[in-house]
UniProtKB/Swiss-Prot annotation:
Keywords linked to the UniProt accession: Chloroplast, Fatty acid biosynthesis, Fatty acid metabolism, Iron, Lipid biosynthesis, Lipid metabolism, Metal-binding, Oxidoreductase, Plastid, Transit peptide
Keyword Iron part of the UniProt annotation: yes
Domain of life where this protein originates: Eukaryota
Cofactor(s) this protein cannot do without: Fe(2+)
Similarity comment: family membership: Belongs to the fatty acid desaturase type 2 family.
Subcellular location: Plastid, Chloroplast
Transit peptide start-stop: 1-32
Name of the protein in question: Stearoyl-[acyl-carrier-protein] 9-desaturase 5, chloroplastic
This enzyme's EC code(s): 1.14.19.2
Reaction(s) catalysed by this chain's protein: octadecanoyl-[ACP] + 2 reduced [2Fe-2S]-[ferredoxin] + O2 + 2 H(+) = (9Z)-octadecenoyl-[ACP] + 2 oxidized [2Fe-2S]-[ferredoxin] + 2 H2O
CDD domains xref list: Acyl_ACP_Desat (cd01050)
Co-factor note (free text): Binds 2 Fe(2+) ions per subunit.
Length: 391
């Protein structure tokens, strides 16, 4: 979740240009609806508030699909053991006041007293994290767009499908827990948050993965580490504000994200082992397009730039920053030993050089941007009852 440089159009490694993330222009569907409305023959159909008009589909060469079929036994041995049995997993209720307890109201009162000490800008970051987690239907859908690894039936016994469903089930607890905690604090406008979640799921996401599992697993590797960092930082902040229970909540979620990061980075590590040239080209492609955050189409019905504003607050508080983005890239380059790859094609060597030298360039650009930065404006956030928060 959180801050990432804005997406810009760039050619992919398979030779097809990538488009922008969103458009405020009128789509053909909307234009047709407007014509219909003028003659009063029908209502305007639903359209998502954020639409992506230029998308690339099915860039994976057919012969590459066989790789993922052959990796089924490997995936069973190396991925499924990273999942926790349900009976041994934590559940949201483990961290919340027990509604059947005589002390329930006292526990809620204590929770609300602790929450009073937490500033609005922190809640903006926490809500943004929670909204991102709550859009889980979109992320399962995204994984099931990937050729060669999707769940073909909804209950497929293939290892890839079992992993995706179980991963989704584990992730589902994150949004549930943060949502219930937020509700009990009384500090945030739950209806505005709920609207934001509905808008976001309706808009979907555009990660630029092109139905291609190479791109998809590179994306999830980056994202799981990003969410691990973000939740870890919100845990640290909560502890500083004196809310040890909230710190425990965020830290527990961060630990899940770290385990999921391990799984996805293992997949990409295996792809580098068996198909290094195509994998490094895919890595460079994703980094040229820039890793968009899962909630980049966020909207609350009011703020057309809600994601950018939320990201700016997260950057200022140190919850998730441009430096984190560069650090994640550097971590993955080292984790996958990209600099040590040999036997690459000419295009592969250029891709290798690009990803291995990108992190320092991102840091330099960020340092220049910070040096030029002016006093950030203060704007209202609907999530905290339109109270103003500095970006």
């Amino acid at each position: 979740m959180a801050f990432a440089p804005s997406h810009t159009a760039s050619p992919s490694y398979c030779g097809v240009a990538q488009g922008g993330r969103r458009s405020n222009g009128m789509s053909p569907v909307v234009a047709m609806a407007s014509t219909i409305n003028r003659v009063k023959t029908a209502k305007k159909p639903y359209t998502p508030p954020r639409e992506v008009h230029l998308q690339v589909k099915h860039s994976l060469p057919p012969q590459k699909r066989e790789i993922f079929d052959s990796l089924q036994p490997w995936a069973k041995e190396n991925l499924l053991n990273l999942l926790k049995p349900v009976e041994k997993s934590w559940q949201p209720q483990d961290f919340l006041p027990d509604p059947s307890s005589d002390g329930f109201y006292d526990e809620v009162k204590e929770l609300r007293e602790r929450a009073k000490e937490i500033p609005d800008d922190y809640f903006v970051c926490l809500v943004g994290d929670m909204v991102t987690e709550e859009a889980l239907p979109t992320y399962q859908t995204m994984l099931n767009t990937l050729d060669g690894v999707r769940d073909e039936t909804g209950a497929s016994p293939t290892t890839w499908a079992v992993w995706t469903r179980a991963w989704t089930a584990e992730e589902n607890r994150h949004g549930d827990l943060l949502n219930k905690y937020m509700y009990l604090t009384g500090r945030v406008d739950m209806k505005q948050i709920e609207k934001t979640i509905q808008y976001l799921i309706g808009s979907g996401m555009d990660p630029g993965t092109e139905n291609n599992p190479y791109l998809g697993f590179l994306y999830t590797s980056f994202q799981e580490r990003a969410t691990f960092i973000s939740h870890g930082n919100t845990a640290r902040h909560a502890k500083e504000y004196g809310d040890l229970k909230l710190a425990q909540i965020c830290g527990t979620i961060a630990a899940d994200e770290k385990r999921h990061e391990t799984a996805y980075t293992k997949i990409v590590e295996k792809l580098f082992e068996i198909d290094p040239d195509y994998t490094v080209l895919a890595f460079a492609d994703m980094m040229r397009k820039k890793i968009s955050m899962p909630a980049h189409l966020m909207y609350d019905g009011k703020d057309d730039n809600l994601f950018e504003h939320f990201s700016a607050v997260a950057q200022r508080l140190g919850v998730y920053t441009a430096r984190d983005y560069a650090d994640i890239l550097e971590f993955l380059v080292q984790r996958w030993k990209v600099a040590d790859l040999t036997g690459l094609s000419g295009e592969g060597r250029r891709a290798q050089d690009f990803v291995c030298t990108l992190a320092p360039r991102i840091r330099r650009l960020d340092e220049r941007a910070q040096a030029r930065a002016k006093q950030a404006p203060v704007i209202p956030f609907s999530w905290v009852y339109d109270r103003k928060v500095q970006l």
